[in-house]
Amino acid sequence: MTYLSSNQLKQYEDQGYISPIEVLSNSEALKARKEIELIEKKLPNEIDKSGRYNVHLISPKLDSIVHNSKILDAVESIIGKNILVCSTTLFIKNPNEQGFVSYHQDAKYIGLEPHNWVTAWVALTDSNENNGCMKMLSLIHI
C-alpha cells in the first residue's frame, strides 16, 4: 500500500516537493528539541555551528526520527523500498537570529548521481518569517 496519496505523488512529480506531511506530534517535536539542547550542553565543542551533522548517530532519540515510519513510508512511496540515509543535519535558526541560507538545490551539495533520491526536511518548530521560514520553489528539480 502506498503511504502518499495520488495527489501528493503528482505534486512531487510536477513540483519537485511535497508539503506538508505530518510526521511528529507537538510533544514528539518538543522532546527532540530538548534532546538537541541536552547534546549541545554535553558536547559544546563538537556541536557548534559547523558540527551539527549526523547527530542521530549518538542519540537514539534523534535516530528514532530518522527511522520514523511516516518518513520512511513517504520516501518509499517515491523511490521504493531500497532506502539509505546518507546524512542528517541539524539546522537551528532561532527567532531574530542573524544568518541566512540562500536558495539552493540539495543535489548540488549532496553529490550523488543519478538524482533518484530525496531529502526529508523535518521541522521541530514552527517555520515562519520570524525565524527564517523554509521556502520551496516549484519546478527547480527539472
Say what each PLM segment does.
Residues Y17-S19, T119-A123, C133:
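Conserved hydrophobic/aromatic beta-strand scaffold that supports enzyme active sites
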Residues G111-E129:
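Short, conserved beta-strand element in jelly-roll/cupin
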Residues T89, Q105, V122-D126, S138:
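Short, structured patches in soluble enzyme cores that scaffold and shape functional sites
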Residues M1-L112:
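Non-heme Fe(II)-dependent double-stranded beta-helix
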Residues I21, L137-S138:
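Residue-level detector of conserved, well-ordered beta-strand and adjacent loop positions
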Residues S102-Y103, N130-M136:
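A short secondary-structure junction signal
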Residues I140-I142:
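Conserved small/polar residues in nucleotide/adenosyl-binding loops
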